[in-house]
């Protein structure tokens, strides 16, 4: 039988082990009987039920479970299919283990294996988990020398760094008597451990980010924000904290989330997470493209100064309603017909501080119009240079997102809706 190696552990920024491996008991059934595979599914089920002498009063569910296991055992004993052990149970209690051993069932042996244990309730989306080979993974991993019973990374860091974390499986032979007594065990190939992976994540900061994010989202759902109590429909959110000088990701939180240590404890609990409309398994931090909102004004500000030639001290008077175009007249966020409130005369630095839409409408339009004849979008040029709408280089699967430009719009819409208009420019400059 193939004896899987213990995958090494991902560490956080402070070199604290984020998960560990501990020994659990496995009951394994070794079968070795010839079986005719040239048989229809219906006939197979009928014959197996008779051959296994399953009680007539059993439910269809009970019958299916037992036949599935017994058939798997038979299949594994077929020549050229493989002699991989079949694991009947994992993490068996001492009481159950003793009961099984007392029965002395031939072919049933006990082996110690490794079980991944997570030492933190945080960073579930980042760490990911291990799992058995899926049908679509078997050929790929067998070609790499993996055993059929190998555990591989299924998501997160576990999956992204599988080739580094996973060592080399060993091969162990076990000889048992007819009574089930283990007569001999020996390795022909010793398992070799994999490597550790050091993350830039600071698990303490990650915990602060996740807790704060949860608090904010739940408060939004209950109370909303502002006079209009907006935000009560908040589904989730994300927080990313980077080291400014290096770009290292120190925390990457997504809400809602789940606990890797407990979420599979019960079928009901797991199904509840699967059916949760807020999708706790979805990593919003790197897989969900969102409109940036007013933070995009920083992109516009760079283009205004570097490409538009507008001095940061240039004054524009906020008139509330931007009336340059008859067909589209957006407004500053503090303006309304009832109050007529504006930011008055304002420069670039003040416009950033107060997030004045009007300033960016006017300064942005002047800058865009300067390059109109050249068919150049200065804001898109700056956005691309800053990495927006481009792969970030993070090792986990990510959604690159898009940028607000004529090409992206033409790819997403048809007919008149695919055109790039003055209104699109005004919308783009404020995010």
Regions found by a protein language model. Name each.
Residues 1-191, 214-238, 244, 257, ...:
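Membrane-proximal periplasmic segments of bacterial cell-envelope enzymes
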Residues 91-92, 203-204, 355:
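Short beta->alpha linker loops
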Residues 116-118, 206, 402-403:
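A short acidic, often aromatic-flanked loop/helix-cap motif at beta-alpha or helix-coil junctions
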Residues 174-192, 201, 231-232, 237-295, ...:
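Beta-lactam-recognizing serine transpeptidase/beta-lactamase-like catalytic domain environment
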Residues 197-206:
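Bateman/CBS regulatory modules and CBS-like beta-alpha motifs in cytosolic regions of diverse proteins
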């Amino acid at each position: 039988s193939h004896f899987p190696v213990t995958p090494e552990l991902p560490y956080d920024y402070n070199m604290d082990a984020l998960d560990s491996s501990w020994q659990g008991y496995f009951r394994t059934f070794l079968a070795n009987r010839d079986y005719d595979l040239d048989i229809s599914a219906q006939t197979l089920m009928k014959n197996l039920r008779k051959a296994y002498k399953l009680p007539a009063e059993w439910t269809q569910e009970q019958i299916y479970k037992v036949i599935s296991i017994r058939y798997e055992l038979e299949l594994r004993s077929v020549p050229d299919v493989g002699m991989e052990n079949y694991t009947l149970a994992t993490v068996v209690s001492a009481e159950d283990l003793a009961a099984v051993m007392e029965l002395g069932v031939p072919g049933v042996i006990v082996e110690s294996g490794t079980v991944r244990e997570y030492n933190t309730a945080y960073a579930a989306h980042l760490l990911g988990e291990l799992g058995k080979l899926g049908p679509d993974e078997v050929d790929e991993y067998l070609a790499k020398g993996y055993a059929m019973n190998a555990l591989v990374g299924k998501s997160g860091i576990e999956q992204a760094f599988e080739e580094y974390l996973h060592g080399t499986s060993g091969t162990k032979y076990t000889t048992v008597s007819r009574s089930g007594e283990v007569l001999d065990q020996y390795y022909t190939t010793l398992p070799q451990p994999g490597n550790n992976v050091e993350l830039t994540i600071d698990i303490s900061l990650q915990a602060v980010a996740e807790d704060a994010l949860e608090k904010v989202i739940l408060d939004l759902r209950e109370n909303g924000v502002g006079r209009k109590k907006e935000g009560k429909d908040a589904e989730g959110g994300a927080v990313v904290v980077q080291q400014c000088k290096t770009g290292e990701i120190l925390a990457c939180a997504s809400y809602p989330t789940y606990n890797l240590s407990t979420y599979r404890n019960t079928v009901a609990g797991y199904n509840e997470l699967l059916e949760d409309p807020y999708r706790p398994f979805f990593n919003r931090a790197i897989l969900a493209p969102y409109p940036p909102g007013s933070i995009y004004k920083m992109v516009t500000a760079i283009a205004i100064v570097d490409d538009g030639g507008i001095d940061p001290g240039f004054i524009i008077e906020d008139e509330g309603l931007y009336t340059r175009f008859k067909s589209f007249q957006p407004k500053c966020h503090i303006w309304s017909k009832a109050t007529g409130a504006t930011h008055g005369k304002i420069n670039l630095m003040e416009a950033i501080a107060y997030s004045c839409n009007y300033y960016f409408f006017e300064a942005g339009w002047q800058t865009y119009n300067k390059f109109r004849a050249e068919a150049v979008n200065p804001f898109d040029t700056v956005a691309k240079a800053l990495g927006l709408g481009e792969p970030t280089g993070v090792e986990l699967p990510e959604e690159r997102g898009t940028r607000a430009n004529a090409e992206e719009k033409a790819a997403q819409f048809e007919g008149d809706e695919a055109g790039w208009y003055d209104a699109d420019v005004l919308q783009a400059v404020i995010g």
